[in-house]
């Protein structure tokens, strides 16, 4: 059921080619079945992004309680550029007061993608219960010896036994953002979002650590079926409130004492389906009551659980130094960030120039601020955990092209 769109949400579209290079493109936005009269047409700037576009959305209050009314408006987005085939995204979600980020890759092949409903409003099969800790025996099975955040997740877009389903290679943080944007609402309290994100990460890292599907003879990490794993929707938009939490906590997971593997933190909506794990709507109520993410997680998984951090993050050349870089900081970590930003600005020319001298001055702070603004992060001008790894991830991607 739809509702009158009498509030406003925001959309930013980012267009790149297959190598991640920004593209000058035209973005047309349509509502409903009207394919002739766009509600907005925007051009991307020098870094392949549109400005924030205001679009009507249902009242935010609809997303704050269970119901049958869809709490977001849906728009169809068509991106086109000279030398590339057009891409059409159907059903991009807009929530009141929230920035929606739609990333589109243009190639020589046209694409038409449909974004299915959020699991809280859509009709998806419930999770088949599993043991939260997988038995690991000396049977010759593949098992990692440390908890690792992989650079890439292989997502099987169907149930495990469906050999016709496509396997997609998705960067880990992008995968978590997609799942969280498909499983919960971005209007919820930050601590609720954090608790749900950490549960999603922990579940996913359990699949990685135990090589669950590979030990069953499959060649993927996880599926997009809610009966087996989480909901992942190819090409879907994400939301700034969720994206920022993932950037900050993407290496965190749920642990129990004396258990090495991340806990398989199963969850359900708590209204249409129930389970022994986290209730998504229940976590929303706890967040409204001021509970922290850890308190929310302990409410569902027990008082002995704690939030752990993965030992290894794959694909990152230099690990976070353990403290925030700011004006007055100096040394090798500052040099690392300066070198990485210097390479990034060759592609993202809106980032101002900076010296590579190992001293965190005003120019470095200005470059960091512009990077944060460009990638929809809180603009602080300082390099915290989230900014360090965001810069590093983009640096690695662009360095491969250099």
PLM regions: where:
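Beta-strand-rich domain onsets/edges
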Residues: 1-22, 42
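Short coil/turn motifs at beta-sheet boundaries
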Residues: 6, 20, 70-72, 97
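Conserved, single-site charged/polar hotspot
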Residues: 2-4, 24-28, 33, 43, ...
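Exposed beta-strand and adjacent loop surfaces of beta-rich binding modules
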Residues: 10-12, 24-26, 74-76
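A short, solvent-exposed beta-strand micro-motif common in secreted/extracellular proteins
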Residues: 60-83
């Amino acid at each position: 059921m739809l509702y009158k769109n009498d509030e406003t949400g925001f959309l930013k579209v980012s267009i790149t080619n297959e190598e991640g290079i920004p593209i000058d493109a035209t973005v047309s936005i349509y509502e409903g079945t009207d394919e002739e009269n766009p509600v907005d047409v925007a051009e991307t700037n020098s870094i392949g992004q549109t400005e924030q576009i205001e679009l009507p959305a249902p009242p935010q209050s609809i997303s704050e309680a269970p119901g049958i009314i869809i709490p977001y408006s849906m728009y169809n987005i068509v991106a086109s550029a000279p030398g590339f085939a057009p891409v059409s995204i159907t059903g991009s979600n807009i929530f009141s007061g929230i920035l929606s980020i739609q990333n589109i890759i243009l190639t020589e092949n046209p694409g038409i993608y449909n974004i299915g409903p959020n699991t809280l409003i859509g009709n998806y099969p419930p999770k088949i219960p599993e043991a939260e800790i997988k038995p690991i025996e000396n049977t010759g099975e593949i098992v990692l010896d440390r908890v690792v955040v992989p650079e890439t997740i292989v997502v099987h877009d169907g149930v495990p036994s469906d050999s016709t389903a496509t396997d997609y290679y998705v960067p880990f943080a992008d995968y978590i953002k997609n799942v969280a944007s498909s499983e919960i609402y971005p209007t919820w309290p930050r601590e609720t979002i954090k608790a749900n994100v950490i549960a999603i990460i922990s579940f996913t890292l359990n699949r990685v650590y135990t090589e669950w599907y590979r030990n069953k003879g499959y060649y993927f990490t996880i599926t997009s079926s809610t009966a087996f794993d989480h909901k992942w929707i190819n090409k879907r938009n994400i939301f700034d409130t969720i994206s920022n939490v993932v950037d900050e906590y993407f290496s965190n997971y749920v642990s129990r004492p004396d258990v090495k593997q991340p806990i398989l933190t199963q969850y359900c909506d708590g209204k249409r389906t129930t389970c022994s794990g986290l209730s998504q709507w229940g976590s929303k109520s706890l967040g409204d009551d001021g509970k922290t993410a850890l308190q929310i997680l302990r409410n569902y998984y027990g008082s002995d659980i704690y939030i752990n951090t993965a030992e290894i993050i794959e694909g990152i050349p230099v690990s976070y130094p353990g403290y925030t870089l700011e004006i007055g900081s100096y040394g090798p970590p500052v040099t690392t960030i300066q070198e990485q930003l210097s390479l990034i600005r060759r592609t993202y020319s809106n980032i101002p120039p900076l010296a590579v001298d190992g001293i965190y001055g005003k120019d470095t702070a200005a470059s960091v601020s512009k990077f944060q603004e460009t990638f929809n992060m809180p603009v602080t001008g300082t390099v915290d955990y989230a900014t360090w790894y965001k810069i590093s991830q983009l640096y690695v991607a662009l360095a491969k092209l250099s």
